[in-house]
């Protein structure tokens, strides 16, 4: 009888060797230096697209340079895990062995009828309009935002959600967005590495299913002048392997002190590394949307609301050095013990603050 002449071994799963010279890398590699490696990322689920097994992987050069976006993310997640776990073990909970950043992203998009899309060379070539006349009616009345989802779009959304569930992407919401023919979906939060992989996968699925419904999908941040563009807002936090959200206040002063510890360090990190945060989203397309045209501006700031601002003001009044017994008591009674357990709606959201 016949035998298979090809099989997929464990070694092939763990490591492969693609060409590392043709990949855009900003000059890290010379074009004649071709050897590179992909390595399996077992922390993100493999999945099947059609009949193809897709394996989340990192991509490095023969000499160790990072050639992808996943490797820096994994390094950052590991650094946060080590630092946060040390703090938890030393001061708050010795049972914590891992701290994972969690991420819930939003995906905004425009749908354009395929025939109309193909009649616009600027849309086809750049993903955005380069010239045109403002419409007689835009988003002034909010009638699209608060209106019903069109039937054709709803059919697209339903098929998209079914495909997402097949691939383990936990989408939960669908709705119209502000601009005409702009829409949004969002998932449940996940571990940050998995969430990023799922968002990349989702955009590929969205474009493929849009084609089936005779739509073309636009992900450009500012495809049309005069109406809102598409943002990708991120809801971010830190979670322990014991089930705690470290950026959520607790029921007692000790838990609130734990929250304040991570809260002030997050603000310090935003202050110290604002340039890196800004650089991470400083694409040409995003700069069309930010600052001059839409909130938020290019200046990195953090809006925390009047309640938490008051808490930090009280903390600043404590004298330098060791706390006196009176200060310890006053701090516990006046600040740490009084943060409400749930901060839901304690403060508005400030659209002029990129980190809010």
Each language-model region and where it sits:
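Glycine-rich, acidic/polar active-site loops that bind/position phosphate-bearing ligands
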Residues: 1-219, 224-356
């Amino acid at each position: 009888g016949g035998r298979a002449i090809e099989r997929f071994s464990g070694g092939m799963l763990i490591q492969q060797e693609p060409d590392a010279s043709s990949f855009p890398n900003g000059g890290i590699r010379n074009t004649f230096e071709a050897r590179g490696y992909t390595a399996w990322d077992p922390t993100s689920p493999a999945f099947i697209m059609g009949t193809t097994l897709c394996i989340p992987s990192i991509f490095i050069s023969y000499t160790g340079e990072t050639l992808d976006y996943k490797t820096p993310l994994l390094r950052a997640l590991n650094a946060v895990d080590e630092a946060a776990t040390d703090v938890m073990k030393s001061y708050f909970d010795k049972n914590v062995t891992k701290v994972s950043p969690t991420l819930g992203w939003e995906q905004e998009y425009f749908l354009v009828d395929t025939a109309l899309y193909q009649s616009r060379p600027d849309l086809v070539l750049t993903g955005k309009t380069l010239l045109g006349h403002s419409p007689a009616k835009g988003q002034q009345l909010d009638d699209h935002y608060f209106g019903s989802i069109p039937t054709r779009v709803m059919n697209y959304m339903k098929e998209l959600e079914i495909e997402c569930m097949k691939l383990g992407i936990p989408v939960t919401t669908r709705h119209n967005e502000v601009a005409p023919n702009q829409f949004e979906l969002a998932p449940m939060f996940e571990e940050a590495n998995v969430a990023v992989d799922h968002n990349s996968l989702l955009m590929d699925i969205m474009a493929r299913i849009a084609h089936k419904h005779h739509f073309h999908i636009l992900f450009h941040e500012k495809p049309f002048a005069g109406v809102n563009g598409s943002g990708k807002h991120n809801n971010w936090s830190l979670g322990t392997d014991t089930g705690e959200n470290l950026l959520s206040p607790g029921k007692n002063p000790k838990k609130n002190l734990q929250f304040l510890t991570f809260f002030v360090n997050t603000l310090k990190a935003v202050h110290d590394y604002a340039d890196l945060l800004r650089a991470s989203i400083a694409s040409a397309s995003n700069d069309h949307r930010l600052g001059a045209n839409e909130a938020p501006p290019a200046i990195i700031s953090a809006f925390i609301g009047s309640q938490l601002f008051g808490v930090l003001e009280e903390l600043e009044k404590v004298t330098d050095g060791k706390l006196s017994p009176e200060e310890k008591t006053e701090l516990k009674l006046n600040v740490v013990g009084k943060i409400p357990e749930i901060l839901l709606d304690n403060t508005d959201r400030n659209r002029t603050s990129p980190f809010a």
